[in-house]
Regions:
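Short, intrinsically disordered N-terminal pre-domain segments
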Residues: 1-12, 165
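Extracellular carbohydrate-recognition regions
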Residues: 7-25
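Terminal beta-strand-rich extracellular "head" domains
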Residues: 20-165
Length: 165
């Protein structure tokens, strides 16, 4: 359902798109390579841009990082096509011991056209092929958390109360 509110202040902090993959489903995984790729065609979020034209995209996923660097990015296509190189971030550095953990990461996207529908896919890569495995889901005890991706409306940039830069 598209956003129907019209006042900008009604959007600030509102979740305007949400996807979860792996609730009560067989666990799944994706092994990273040294090139960005969309991790699963369902790993996406769709939303209608708020009046501010600014959103925060959030992702949460479990990973076996095996002492390697991991990078997360956003794509505007189900086959990885970078949204912008400034949205490709290093998110995990080599740990001293086990690298298994949940990574929560956010992007702030500005310059969107209010009222326009957008759809972004989650992409990832590693510095070494086949070294990192992302995992999600489960339908039994002691399995993985679901993959989560959401879009939250951010306020219009005003004075010192919302600064994007």
């Amino acid at each position: 359902m598209p956003n129907t509110l019209t006042k900008a202040e009604n959007f600030d902090g509102r979740i305007i798109g949400y996807t979860t993959v792996g609730i009560d489903a067989a666990d799944d995984s994706f092994t990273l390579t040294d090139s960005f790729a969309v991790t699963d065609s369902a790993h996406k979020v769709k939303f209608v841009a708020p009046p501010s034209g600014v959103v925060e995209i959030f992702v949460s996923v479990y990973g076996d990082f095996l002492r390697r660097f991991a990078y997360f990015g956003l794509s505007d296509n189900a086959t990885y096509n970078t949204l912008d190189v400034t949205h490709e971030h290093i998110v995990a550095q080599p740990p001293t011991a086990s690298g298994d953990r949940v990574i929560n990461h956010q992007w702030v996207i500005t310059g969107l056209t209010a009222g326009t529908a957008y759809e972004y896919w989650f992409g990832a890569k590693s510095t070494h092929s086949l070294a990192i495995v992302l995992r999600w889901g489960g339908n039994a005890t002691e399995e993985y958390a679901p993959f989560i991706m959401k879009a939250t409306a951010l306020p219009t940039a005003v004075a010192d109360f919302a600064v994007y830069g």
